[in-house]
Amino acid sequence: MSDFENFFRTDIVPEELSIDSLSFVGDAVYSLYFRIKTLRSAKRRTGYQHNLTLLYVEAKGQRKALEVIEKFLSEEERIIVRRGYNSRGARKRGDDENYKCATALEALVGYLFLKGRYRRLEELLEKVENDVSSWKKCAERDSKT
């Protein structure tokens, strides 16, 4: 295993981190995951890739993503989502429902990543990707009108 691979294998215990710290990590993991997915499926100009990635990573898109996966979550995962939704970081934007849901999703992603539950994380993110494909078609259709 390379040093780079070892870098992501961590002895950090997610349960000992604040929920906002989990969201901080989750934001990076989620964004990187969909940036790479976008590169694989949209081998076009960077501007197009950026706009496509925004469908996934903006707060509104993350709220939709959370709605897609909520019914598949375990009780443990639901607790993390609930904590993320109610976190101090989520409340910074006042009553912005999109931002609260985005923070909740990021907390879950960060938690699963730091727990090393990569298969579970991929399973959930693939559900998001499959659902967002329909948003992408709508966005492309709307941009042509």
From Swiss-Prot:
<keyword id="KW-0378">Hydrolase</keyword>
<protein>
    <recommendedName>
        <fullName>Mini-ribonuclease 3</fullName>
        <ecNumber>3.1.26.-</ecNumber>
    </recommendedName>
</protein>
<feature type="active site">
    <location>
        <position position="27"/>
    </location>
</feature>
<dbReference type="InterPro" id="IPR036389">
    <property type="entry name" value="RNase_III_sf"/>
</dbReference>
<dbReference type="InterPro" id="IPR000999">
    <property type="entry name" value="RNase_III_dom"/>
</dbReference>
<dbReference type="GO" id="GO:0006364">
    <property type="term" value="P:rRNA processing"/>
</dbReference>
<keyword id="KW-0699">rRNA-binding</keyword>
<comment type="subunit">
    <text>Homodimer.</text>
</comment>
<keyword id="KW-0460">Magnesium</keyword>
<comment type="function">
    <text>Involved in correct processing of both the 5' and 3' ends of 23S rRNA precursor. Processes 30S rRNA precursor transcript even in absence of ribonuclease 3 (Rnc); Rnc processes 30S rRNA into smaller rRNA precursors.</text>
</comment>
<keyword id="KW-0698">rRNA processing</keyword>
<dbReference type="GO" id="GO:0019843">
    <property type="term" value="F:rRNA binding"/>
</dbReference>
<keyword id="KW-0690">Ribosome biogenesis</keyword>
<dbReference type="InterPro" id="IPR008226">
    <property type="entry name" value="Mini3_fam"/>
</dbReference>
<keyword id="KW-0255">Endonuclease</keyword>
<keyword id="KW-0540">Nuclease</keyword>
<dbReference type="Pfam" id="PF00636">
    <property type="entry name" value="Ribonuclease_3"/>
</dbReference>
<keyword id="KW-0694">RNA-binding</keyword>
<dbReference type="GO" id="GO:0004525">
    <property type="term" value="F:ribonuclease III activity"/>
</dbReference>
<keyword id="KW-0963">Cytoplasm</keyword>
<dbReference type="GO" id="GO:0005737">
    <property type="term" value="C:cytoplasm"/>
</dbReference>
<comment type="similarity">
    <text>Belongs to the MrnC RNase family.</text>
</comment>
